[in-house]
Design a protein with these regions (language model features):
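Extracellular/periplasmic periplasmic-binding protein-like sensory domains
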Residues: 24, 31, 131-210, 289-297
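Sec-exported extracytoplasmic/periplasmic mature domains
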Residues: 2-6, 46-50, 78-82, 86, ...
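Segments of small-molecule ligand-sensing domains
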Residues: 190-203, 214-285
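Extracellular/periplasmic catalytic domains that process cell-envelope and extracellular macromolecules
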Residues: 1-5, 21-22, 54-55, 108-110, ...
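A structural signal for well-ordered alpha-helical segments within the folded catalytic domains
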Residues: 39, 125, 207-215, 232
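Extracellular/periplasmic Venus flytrap/periplasmic-binding protein
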Residues: 16-17, 25-135, 172-179
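Venus flytrap/periplasmic-binding-protein-like
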Residues: 9-10, 16-19, 96, 137-156, ...
């Protein structure tokens, strides 16, 4: 991307260090990087406990995919454990994660207050089903950004009821931009996906991605002219992204997309999540936007 000067949009994923656009000028982990992800989850757990100071003495276990992605946040969890006084444990699940009996039996013995699931693919429903089998409650498990879709919970059946996860793009069709898509695309039959997919987590991620891309192009063309943009010009457009609540309301995405402010040095721009809970059929929002501790994380 850097050699070719073509922006690479790694929305909600990619290595955390690519957040610094001064070092990685053409990579944009928009909205949420892995460090922000776990920081926001810990902040939510603190909120549920009655304040971050109440985390002292609590037990938080992270069960993670055995890959560089899964391991990336281990030092951040340990840093937050030291800061707030909770006990952190890390449990690895080798890829692909279709056998987790030993890991969840160990978790049950340890009796953590919360489990953070940093999964991938088949690992997610297997984790939920195995937790249920050994008696660990689903409503004390919080899935990360790769453990938050309908596809992650439906295969687990009733065991998934109560399971929590984070999201940067809540499911649902109530947002004005989704209603416009329904009116102009879905209802006239111009869509190319099953109707039940409309408004799901991954569908709404696509909508958010589209909003961010179009806004970056709009800003760049306002500066450089309505033409085919170069990679350098489009990079400039992404670095000018500004979404406050006023602008989010204008594009019909208030509540669907978090407030964002990007810059040359900050290619994430947000660092917030919402919590959602699976009721057996749909995800239900259970929190407003919860911000990561970016002041702590950015120097790292």
């Amino acid at each position: 991307a850097t050699a070719d000067k073509i922006p690479l949009i790694t929305i909600n994923h990619g290595r955390t260090d690519t957040t610094d656009g001064r070092v990685f000028p053409y990579i944009f982990p928009l909205q949420l990087n892995p460090y922000s992800e776990v920081s926001a989850i810990v902040n939510y757990i603190g909120q549920q406990a009655g304040g971050l100071d109440k985390l002292k003495g609590k037990k938080i276990t992270v069960i993670y995919h055995g890959s560089p992605y899964g391991k990336e946040t281990i030092p951040i969890i340990d840093l937050l454990a030291k800061k707030y006084g909770f006990q952190a444990k890390h449990v690895e699940v080798p890829h692909p994660g279709n056998e987790q009996q030993a890991q969840w039996l160990a978790i049950r013995r340890d009796k953590p207050d919360w489990v953070i699931l940093r999964g991938w693919g088949v690992m997610n429903p297997v984790a939920i089903k195995t937790a249920h089998k050994v008696g660990y409650p689903a409503n004390r498990i919080i899935g990360n950004i790769w453990s938050n879709s309908e596809e992650d919970v439906r295969p687990a059946g009733d065991a998934a009821k109560g399971f929590l996860s984070i999201t940067t793009h809540p499911s649902g069709t109530q947002f004005p931009v989704l209603q416009q898509i329904k009116q102009h695309v879905i209802d006239p039959g111009h869509g190319n996906l099953p109707a039940e997919r409309f408004g799901t987590v991954y569908y709404n991620l696509g909508v958010v991605n589209g909003i961010l891309n179009v806004e970056a192009v709009r800003l760049a063309q306002a500066r450089f002219g309505v033409k085919t943009l170069s990679g350098e010009e489009l990079r400039w457009g992404f670095e000018q992204l500004r979404f406050d609540n006023k602008r989010l309301k204008e594009v019909g995405a208030l509540g669907l997309l978090q407030p964002l402010k990007l810059s040359c040095a900050d290619h994430e721009g947000g660092g917030a999540v919402r919590l959602q809970q699976w009721d057996g059929q749909h995800w239900q929002p259970v929190s407003d936007w919860i911000q990561a501790d970016r002041a702590l994380l950015r120097p790292i």
